[in-house]
Amino acid sequence: MDYKVKDLSLAEQGKKQIEWAEIHMPALMEIRKQFEKEKPLQGLRISAVLHVTKETAVLVKTLKIGGATVALAGSNPLSTQDDVAAALVEEGIRVFAWRGETEKDYYDNIKEILKYEPQIIMDDGGDLHAYVHENMPQLKLFGGTEETTTGVIRLKAMEEQGVLRYPVIAVNNAFTKYLFDNRIGTGQSTIDGILRATNILIAGKVAVVAGYGWVGRGIAQRLRGMGARVIVVEVSPLRALEAVMDGFDVMPMSKAAELGEIFITATGNINVIRKEHILKMKDGAILANSGHFNVEIDVKGLKEMAKSSRLIRPNLEEYELPNGKRIYLLAEGRLVNLAAAEGHPSEVMDLSFSNQALSVKYIYENRGKLENKVYNVPQEIDETVAKLKLNGMGIEIEPMTQEQIEYMKQWRYGT
């Protein structure tokens, strides 16, 4: 079996990490039991570009137990957990991923997992989907899935331009994904990454959050909960209004740059923090990114104008500006929660990856019946995931009476 990981001797530690995740992912483990019994993915070939974490390992093992053959590459050069990658190889998964990949390594690994002629592809960020469309028109795919807001935006653009060649389920758009993974998971793991990289006190700091989507609001809420004074930067009047009504200050980055001590980007867009903003910042300002790609902070511009730079501690680099101020960049401007920490807690990835597993099953069962467009996760899958999670937490919900069911179907009775 082909694979390329950093060190197979790390496999034993990786297995322990995966076991720890499995304990905290009851919904996906219940799906695994069903997959083991029914083998709904028998004969299916899957290639996936996902963050190679212990939680992803639980998903990939579940797909394999369901009958699929899986090849896996990492979706970020700094997010792979090398012990987990080694453990997955021993589980019979073709893994091409290691922490610290170059850009060439990253795309070479994507090429490797596509050699197995997948029938379904799974992506986190849209790079795999884009690569297939640009370089492998011969692939005959039943469909694909996409985990992130960034990837869904790219896929919707492909659909609108008429170039999308297969159906894709936007796992990101499931209620049981974005309400928990994007908001709660990213909120917690982003703060975790910042603290691991800096060990600073959050209380009393002025924090600037760029973007008030589900990710941004989760980060802003947790910063406030830890005692920070939070400023939100938004381009959408609707989200800006929501941030104001949630009690946050809202202003352009040009003004926030002079006030902030911690800056976190979560927009999915490019050059949100630019050179003109950085020059206005206070001495000692900290820059972190929680968007998918390392383009939200103008890292190139920062490096070009810096007089000098030095690594202070892992994932914390100091840049001295011509004006004498020092700016601190976390994790090279890449995903701070995965590069400087371990990503989302297993409990929240339980929801996202349950949606992934059931979406793959749905695509396989409906192959040839779906149009070449971006679909939301079917409501029945979303509700199934919520029920499985509640069951795993030992929580019961109130059932409706027959009278209530009938009342919800009628229109005659009012005041």
From Swiss-Prot:
One of its GO terms (cellular component) is cytosol. Keywords: Cytoplasm, Hydrolase, NAD, One-carbon metabolism. It comes from the Archaea. Coiled coil: none annotated. One of its GO terms (molecular function) is adenosylhomocysteinase activity. Substrate binds at residues 53, 124, 147, 177, 181. Its cofactor is NAD(+). It catalyses: S-adenosyl-L-homocysteine + H2O = L-homocysteine + adenosine. Binds 1 NAD(+) per subunit. NAD(+) binds at residues 148-150, 182, 211-216, 234, 269, 290-292, 337. Pathway: Amino-acid biosynthesis; L-homocysteine biosynthesis; L-homocysteine from S-adenosyl-L-homocysteine: step 1/1. Its EC number is 3.13.2.1. Its main location: cytoplasm. PANTHER family: ADENOSYLHOMOCYSTEINASE. Belongs to the adenosylhomocysteinase family. May play a key role in the regulation of the intracellular concentration of adenosylhomocysteine. This is Adenosylhomocysteinase. The gene is ahcY.
